């Protein structure tokens, strides 16, 4: 049994317990319902949550992907309903809320859901400028991360990205991890749309790329013409690009040989997590490209993301004149929703000054 299935098997009973009490309180607010019906609903929700993960680990199918999307939307809605209920009960301690007001407050969730779903699927292109003194000539990088190809977003997201990249004036595209989500198997032809991209595409794996098998991800990448940097370096024009593969064994800063730095080139580091920037910068890397955080993906997780990660999203510059860019990613994990963050491709214009 793979990592994703094991995690689902462990979490599903607790998730169902949460859903039972959530549904119970929602129905209490609107008049109540027999607990037997709530139990049936809970079992149904549990099946929708767990069964697609089992089938998708063998072969991805349209019906199981559809159920995964429904489950993801409902997980998001459950969190929103929970906050709604807490708010209603707090206010109700001080004033009596009419039934119509309670109903309106509950209806905010599906209205927000429409916006969140659209936001999660509306791929936008941002542009940022990086000024470097040691840059031989201007060059542009399309930075992507966290595509999360899997049960929530399948081949269409790859086609959409490829089409968008072909409409961007860039020299190179870099994917800083989590090309795959780990919720479905990756088949050899899944990334073939990237073969039609009119620029080199470079990829260094992140944590999710391992969940269903990193070998399948790398094989599909290579078939699609994607350059995989697995603790390897490459030169591209005036750039020396090094990719550090995500390791579950890393404790603190990954070991790097300073000989990887090429003083006559601009040194770019691809590292999925936005960690150790200070150390890598002092070592000589001019630009670090990271993802992983999703910027929190949606409220209220965005607030917690800012607390958990020192560098949650955006472009950062230190006193050495070196940069860290943390993108909020293209895809989504667990739920196909976004609120307060963009599904983005970021064009980084590296300019000499």
PLM feature segments, named:
Residues 1-123:
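Non-catalytic terminal accessory segments
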Residues 63-71, 92-108, 114-145, 150-168, ...:
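N-terminal signal-anchor transmembrane helix
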């Amino acid at each position: 049994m793979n990592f994703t299935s094991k995690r689902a098997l462990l979490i599903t009973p607790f998730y169902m317990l949460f859903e039972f009490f959530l549904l119970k309180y929602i129905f209490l607010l609107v008049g109540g319902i027999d607990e037997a019906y709530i139990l049936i609903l809970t079992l149904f929700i549990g099946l929708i949550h767990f069964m697609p993960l089992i089938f998708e680990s063998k072969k991805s199918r349209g019906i199981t992907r559809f159920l995964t999307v429904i489950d993801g939307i409902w997980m998001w809605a459950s969190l929103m309903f929970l906050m709604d209920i807490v708010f209603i009960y707090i206010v109700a301690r001080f004033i009596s809320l009419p039934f119509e007001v309670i109903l309106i407050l509950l209806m905010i969730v599906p209205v927000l859901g429409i916006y969140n779903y659209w936001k999660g699927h509306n791929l936008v292109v941002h542009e940022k400028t990086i000024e470097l003194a040691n840059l031989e000539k201007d060059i542009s990088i399309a930075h992507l991360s966290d595509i999360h190809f899997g049960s929530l977003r399948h081949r269409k997201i790859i086609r959409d990205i490829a089409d968008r990249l072909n409409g961007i004036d860039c020299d190179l595209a870099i994917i800083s991890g989590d090309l795959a989500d780990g919720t479905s198997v990756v088949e050899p032809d899944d990334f073939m749309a990237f073969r039609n991209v009119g620029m080199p595409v470079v990829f260094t794996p992140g944590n999710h790329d391992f969940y269903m098998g990193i070998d399948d991800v790398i094989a599909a990448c290579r078939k699609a013409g994607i350059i995989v940097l697995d603790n390897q370096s490459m030169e591209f024009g005036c750039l020396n690009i090094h990719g550090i593969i995500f390791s579950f064994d890393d404790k603190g800063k990954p070991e790097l040989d300073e000989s990887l730095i090429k003083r006559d080139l601009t040194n770019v580091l691809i590292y999925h997590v936005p960690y150790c920037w200070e150390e890598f910068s002092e070592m000589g890397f001019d630009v670090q490209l990271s993802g992983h955080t999703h910027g929190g993906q949606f409220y209220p997780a965005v607030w917690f993301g800012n607390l958990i990660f020192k560098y949650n999203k955006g472009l950062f510059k230190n006193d050495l004149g070196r940069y860290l860019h943390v993108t909020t990613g293209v895809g989504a994990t667990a739920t196909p929703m976004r609120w307060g963050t963009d599904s983005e491709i970021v064009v980084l214009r590296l300019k000499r000054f």
